[in-house]
Amino acid sequence: MDKLLERFLHYVSLDTQSKAGVRQVPSTEGQWKLLHLLKQQLEEMGLVNVTLSDKGTVMVTLPANVAGDIPAIGFISHVDTSPDFSGKNVNPQIVENYRGGDIALGIGDEVLSPVMFPVLHQLLGQTLITTDGKTLLGADDKAGVAEIMTALAVLKQKDIPHGDIRVAFTPDEEVGKGAKHFDVEAFGAQWAYTVDGGGVGELEFENFNAASVNIKIVGNNVHPGTAKGVMVNALSLAARIHAEVPADESPETTEGYEGFYHLASMKGTVDRADMHYIIRDFDRKQFEARKRKMMEIAKKVGKGLHPDCYIELVIEDSYYNMREKVVEHPHILDIAQQAMRDCDIVPDMKPIRGGTDGAQLSFMGLPCPNLFTGGYNYHGKHEFVTLEGMEKAVQVIVRIAELTAKQQ
């Protein structure tokens, strides 16, 4: 474990923020720097089949050290950080033996407070790694990367019994592109785990069904003084559309298994307005109903417009709930839960109110639930991770490998 923190601090020092709306994969040059570094480190560790694809996926094998028909399993993390907040010049703070109360983030007024984040009350005495209040930390998912790298080193050095272990590091997870170019056949694992979760004990195999909704509104602009019966205000139409969307089914009013509509962006003028929604729901039927609802709203608001004015709606599915694929292979979850219990961790099965590469991979033939990393408050300046949580994640990865070797 001695290099776990060192690895993590090195990885977060590299700016690997991904960028939406870019055709190339990886979407940013910074990701290539970390991917090349990981490839080099894996080669130096003496692992085999180390590859880096032209789409930025690193794959590697730790060969089995025991004989028998043992299934090959995989562990996967992503190297990019969220576009939502700066990941440049990350300056981590290490708070040893946290004693409670507010933690100052840098020299400004920003604090990490248990009033806003009550989970801190559960972390007394632990070592917290925080931001300086100016950037995100990048624990999502460089904690996962560091944990997998450390687990590989532990498995190799301590000669713990295991079958073939396949590992992959992917780009552009935060913008939904990482798994699209993942070669499941080349990866060659029977199942895998993404290491991309939150607090210790989290084990996730349910995620949202997700879709994006883009609405283009074309109006007609004339001088306001002579506008009667002629002007069609695209902004007013946008406001009417949003007024029809259920206000009590938004991200800020929902939790657990509840789905939502989220107006993520809106811009425009009288002539033209654009709206971008995301739709999320765990239930497939409710998911389809939400998409129909958006189409009905657009049709209702657009009824009777002048032929030159119109509302155009495009819905695109992003990913689906991996539950239907993972539950077909219950042993995958059984092994992960047993590994946690063996490490004195109580498994916390909860739905992901989001998505992971594992969701897409599960529908590509690689069942892939999600393991915890020990991190919290992702995508912002209040992000932090505990060193103890990271160490627990390493222990669980190693134990999963060991338990799988007994499955022959």
UniProtKB/Swiss-Prot annotation:
Swiss-Prot/TrEMBL catalytic activity: Release of the N-terminal residue from a tripeptide
Membrane-spanning intervals of the chain: none
Domain of life: Bacteria
Catalytic residues, chain numbering: 80, 173 (proton acceptor)
Cofactor binding note of this UniProt entry: Binds 2 Zn(2+) ions per subunit.
UniProt-listed GO biological process terms: peptide catabolic process; proteolysis
Subcellular location: Cytoplasm
Cofactor(s) needed for function: Zn(2+)
Keywords of this entry: Aminopeptidase, Cytoplasm, Hydrolase, Metal-binding, Metalloprotease, Protease, Zinc
GO molecular function, one term: metallopeptidase activity
Pfam families assigned to the protein according to its UniProt record, in alphabetical order: M20_dimer, Peptidase_M20
Record-listed E.C. numbers: 3.4.11.4
Binding site for Zn(2+) 1: 78, 140, 196
Binding site for Zn(2+) 2: 140, 174, 379
GO CC annotations on file: cytosol
Protein role: Cleaves the N-terminal amino acid of tripeptides.
Family classification: Belongs to the peptidase M20B family.
PANTHER family assigned to the protein according to its UniProt record, in alphabetical order: PEPTIDASE T
Protein name, as recorded: Peptidase T
Species of origin: Citrobacter koseri (strain ATCC BAA-895 / CDC 4225-83 / SGSC4696)
